[in-house]
Regions:
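Terminal accessory carbohydrate-recognition/targeting modules of carbohydrate-active enzymes
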Residues: 1-224
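Solvent-exposed loop and edge beta-strand segments that line ligand/cofactor-binding
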Residues: 226-229
Length: 229
């Protein structure tokens, strides 16, 4: 398997959308979320799907319908990157899972456009070190409780979600006190997953899309395996 940690497995959605279901979770701890081809996040606790919307200089952009969405699974491991074209550049969503506080799904929004933007999340229980905009979502109809955060040019907003199932009091307190800015980055998660899947055994494959595919199959197997204990 290739040791190149920047290799990206790409799915283009510019023409016809190809359905996708990316399984996220903790190595050895099972899966706890699925990300679809548009960046919607569904936890395994039956709670509402987390959708995202971007307010750019011209209007609100809905990734579930925009033709400019492109999605990548970085190096084949469970770090999902969804790009949305907006005036002046891209708004980028990255989703991955960390083991902190019993397991958190981390969602990052990076503004690579030349102008400030805002992002709306359709759930009120996202964990963030920032305070949501008191004005809420203006000019778009979203589910009750949706929250909006500004994202300056060149900056990244990070939030997290915790599945409601199996949340003991100690874990709930840990979630309440978590500092999302100190959670591992998507680069760290990518490196950790690559190391784990490569330790499972080396496979010599041609350069290109095959190595990320092998990494995806191995990482999905680790997430979906039934614990023996």
């Amino acid at each position: 398997m290739s040791n190149t940690q920047g290799v990206i497995s790409s799915i283009s959605l510019s023409a016809r959308v190809r359905p996708a279901a990316h399984v996220l979770g903790i190595r050895g701890g099972g899966w706890n979320a699925i990300v679809n081809e548009r960046g919607s996040v569904r936890l395994n606790d039956g709670s509402p799907v987390l959708d995202w919307h971007i307010a750019a200089d011209d209007r609100w952009h809905d990734p579930s319908t925009e033709p400019s969405v492109r999605q990548t699974r970085r190096a084949g491991v469970p770090v999902i990157e969804t790009r949305l074209r907006i005036p002046g550049g891209d708004a980028i969503q990255r989703v991955y899972t960390v083991a902190d506080a019993g397991g958190l799904v981390v969602i990052e929004i990076t503004n690579e456009s030349t102008l400030p933007i805002a992002v709306a999340f359709t759930r009120p229980d996202v964990i963030s070190s920032r305070t949501p905009s008191p004005r809420g979502a203006q000019g778009i109809e979203l589910p009750a409780g949706s929250v909006v955060f500004p994202v300056a040019h060149g900056s990244t907003l990070r939030v997290a979600l915790r599945a409601a199932i199996h949340v003991a009091n100690a874990v709930a307190n840990a979630v309440a006190n978590v500092d999302v800015e100190r959670l591992p980055s998507f680069e760290q998660l990518q490196k950790g997953w690559l190391k784990a899947v490569e330790q499972a055994g080396y496979v010599i494959v041609p350069e290109g899309a095959v190595a990320p595919l092998v990494a995806r199959l191995r990482s999905d197997a680790r997430l979906l395996a039934i614990p023996t204990s």
